[in-house]
Amino acid sequence: MDRKELQVKERTVTRKSEVKKLRTNNEIPAVLYGKNIESKKLSIEKRELLDALSTAAGDNVLLDLKLDNGESYPAIFKEIQKDPIKGFFIHIDFHTIDLKETLQVSVPLNIEGEPVGVENGGIPQYQLREIEIECLPTQIPDHIEVDVSNIDLNESINVGDLPLPEGSELVTEPEETVMSVVAPETEEEPDTEEDEEGEEDVEEESEEEEEESEE
């Protein structure tokens, strides 16, 4: 489990123009909330944020928030808001945690291997890229390995088949499919008998018309 110390500052600015100025100065507005504390408006330097997100755990990294007033809180990223087009950070939500209490987190799946069913002409279909588990904050895994190399044609691997880290419990329904290998769709061949019957009917009608015209 990766753990990072993060320096943050309490902020008093709340108006849009002031918050926008923060971002111009490479500071990201944030908020900290959780059990038994009053929510705190914060700001964090962009480089500090990028450093915290640079570990293998990504946004599942365990944080030690260090406020400029000397206070310290264990926390996690609750929400990271980014501009959908330009990708810059808009706002960060931090949530304080108790290191002795379990919490529910989404953990990415690391898909490994080439399904044997693909070699046999199948098509792989991936339904899930992450699952939700419950564990202690200090036991949050960076990811969960999923070996799909033994999945054959018309077979699948479900959430309940995955190896969970010690001390964690599954939150996602075990019956949910992670990936499967399906047979390719085949095009239906036209009904040749009906086509032949149709051609015969046309020929008969043509012959009748010729006979009538001769009369």
Curated annotation (Swiss-Prot):
One of its GO terms (molecular function) is 5S rRNA binding. One of its GO terms (cellular component) is cytosolic large ribosomal subunit. The keyword Transferase does not apply. SUPFAM superfamilies: Ribosomal protein L25-like. Pfam families: Ribosomal_L25p, Ribosomal_TL5_C. It comes from the Bacteria. GO terms for biological process: translation. Residues 185-215 have a biased composition (Acidic residues). Keywords: Ribonucleoprotein, Ribosomal protein, RNA-binding, rRNA-binding. The keyword NADP does not apply. Residues 160-215 are annotated as: Disordered. HAMAP family: Ribosomal_bL25_CTC (MF_01334). Belongs to the bacterial ribosomal protein bL25 family. CTC subfamily. This is one of the proteins that binds to the 5S RNA in the ribosome where it forms part of the central protuberance. Part of the 50S ribosomal subunit; part of the 5S rRNA/L5/L18/L25 subcomplex. Contacts the 5S rRNA. Binds to the 5S rRNA independently of L5 and L18. NCBIfam families: bL25_bact_ctc, PRK05618.2-4. This is Large ribosomal subunit protein bL25. It comes from Natranaerobius thermophilus (strain ATCC BAA-1301 / DSM 18059 / JW/NM-WN-LF).
